[in-house]
Amino acid sequence: VSDWNQFKGDAHHSGTRLDREGPRRIERSWTADFVGPVGEPVCDHETVFVGTAQGNLYAIDATTGSRRWVVETTAATDRAPIVSREMVHFGTDAGKLYAVDRTSGDRYWTLTLPGPLTASPTQFEDRLYVGYEGGLAVCVAETGEVIWSYDTDGSVVGCPAVTDDREWSGPRVYAGTDEEAVFCLEAGDGEEVWRVPTDGVLAGGPTVAEGRVYVADDAGTLLSLDTDTGQSWFTYKTDGGFSSSVTVRSGENLAVDEVTTAEEVTEGTTFIGANDGYVHVTDTTFGRRKVRGWLFSKKGVALDGEIHASPVVVGNVVCLADTTGSVYGIDATRYDHWWYEQLEDAVTNTPAVGQRRLFVPCEDDRLYCLEWDPDEQPGL
């Protein structure tokens, strides 16, 4: 089973690993140095794959941080790559999409897109979904053959999300544009199913969970939309703007225990970073605030800086990072702090989750590995 093979771990962009015990105590295991701010990592079978704002794709040993191979490029590669059984796919700001051997870095194919990539690509089954300036393209992962493309008025914003439903004729893809809209396409032929305007430009791509699409924008609006029709289930608004994609701790994957209530299992929780220094926390039923104060509910959990990196959830722990370089572990139901780690510069790209490891990219040109031992965790 893959650890975290693409942006936020899967084609839905869930950003969660609820089947694992979360880190209630962490230690810094290693750091790896690069040239340029580090992009969004992915990891699979003890190897981390990551690019930088200066270019190149690197394969790093997940245990030691040592370099296994590097593919040189002349353009930025800071979007999350995709790793599969045999290949690694990654794109550049120059509009190139590459497929290389996951073991050696040897190149299989190169695809030139009509414009620079604007987000991480997504893989669903044997196809890649790639957003760029002016549209979205779908190609065969093994060969790079383009199946169809969809023109947009502006640039695709954030990583496209793909999901399937047994009542549909095939999968569907969800994406946003900088023209302040989110849309749904048939994954088979690119036919538009629905389009919904947003109040601002999406902050990161859509997230799909339990039949809903969640999008947050830089105008401070969170929308929960029906995956089939685009109908709005709820709207949550805040002053300022959101600055990360939505992470959903889905209730359908939880069990009632000493820290997870029956209400949590029924409704689930959203976590969204904002430029007001809060991770906003709502339920998935009505979009109500879930963090309680002495007299009134609070908008979320306060951090030291803006939150551009999307939250990731491991078990019952939400892992967060902000623009001051602070990294936190927060209880996902009580919202108390479990741990805190201070890095040397801002964290603006989303971390990756491995086996008992969190890989955090930093703007100080380093990748940090934070590690935990499930047998040496503090009690609940």
Model-derived features: positions:
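Extracytoplasmic/lumenal domain signature
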Residues: 1, 5-78, 82-118, 122-380
